[in-house]
């Protein structure tokens, strides 16, 4: 579990995060949604230590990341898997070498052990046959699957996904969502997904946080976000035709 307690963050005179309180549950797909420029990515970067907070606490299973020394922070970062918006894969490395990369950086595993682990992770995303090829030989959807394999290579306790469906067609998005959900439940990971994709929110979101103007305006489950009357959330939700249909259908069933 991850807890965010009273977190504030400014850049110059601009306060980007204002007294944020939130919780992200273990074994659940936790989603951060909201309009662009309202603090979603900044919050995620603060949680994983890419930005320092001005004040507040970030607890990883009750361990306060903000007061840890460098060595302690490194140990926590080893427990975090990252799936980036862009694939962030190394074109000069094979698929297998990409998955092995964090293992080579942060473990003392032998090459054989790393290959075995990489093969296991690639098999988990149905890409075993791709191990000796290069990422550039694959579509965006397959590159995302390679990214997932790399993200779970270290057997993480926490998984952060930044816009995992960005640039993907609907069919591929459903596949990526399914993998994220399966891995979260199978390994009991605390997963945090930053997204604009309301389809994903309804399909796999267990715990949803709506951030607006740098504040946590609302947090709840998918049923709650479908039925909420909060005007700021509604303005964001109704930008999705899919969500309009879902809300209309639910309202009709309740009549």
Q: Predicted segments — roles?
A:
Residues 48:
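Helix-to-loop junction immediately C-terminal to a conserved catalytic motif
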Residues 64, 111-129:
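Conserved ABC ATPase "signature" region
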Residues 153-157:
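A short, proline-enriched helix->beta-strand linker immediately N-terminal to the Walker B motif
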Residues 159-162:
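Catalytic Walker B motif of ABC-type/P-loop ATPase nucleotide-binding domains
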């Amino acid at each position: 579990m991850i807890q965010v307690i009273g977190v504030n963050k400014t850049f110059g005179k601009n306060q980007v995060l204002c007294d944020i309180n939130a919780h992200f549950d273990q074994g659940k797909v936790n989603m951060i949604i909201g309009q662009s420029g309202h603090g979603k990515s900044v919050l995620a970067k603060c949680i994983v230590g890419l930005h320092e907070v001005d004040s507040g606490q970030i607890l990883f299973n009750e361990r306060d990341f903000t007061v840890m020394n460098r060595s302690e922070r490194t140990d926590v970062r080893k427990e975090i898997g990252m799936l980036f918006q862009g694939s962030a894969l190394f074109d000069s490395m094979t698929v297998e070498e990409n998955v092995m990369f964090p293992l080579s950086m942060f473990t003392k595993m032998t090459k054989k052990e790393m290959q075995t682990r990489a093969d296991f992770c690639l098999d988990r995303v149905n890409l075993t046959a791709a191990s000796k090829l290069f990422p550039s030989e694959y579509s965006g959807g397959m590159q995302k699957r390679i990214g997932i394999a790399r993200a779970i290579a270290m057997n993480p306790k926490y998984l952060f996904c930044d816009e995992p469906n960005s640039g993907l067609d609907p069919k591929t998005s459903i596949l990526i969502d399914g993998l994220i959900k399966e891995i979260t439940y199978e390994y009991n990971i605390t997963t945090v997904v930053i997204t604009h994709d309301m389809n994903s929110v309804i399909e796999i979101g267990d715990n949803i946080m709506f951030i607006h103007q740098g504040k946590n305006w609302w947090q709840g489950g998918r049923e709650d976000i479908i039925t909420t009357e909060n005007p700021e959330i509604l303005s964001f939700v109704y930008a999705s035709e899919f969500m309009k249909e879902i809300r209309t259908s639910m309202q009709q069933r309740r009549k």
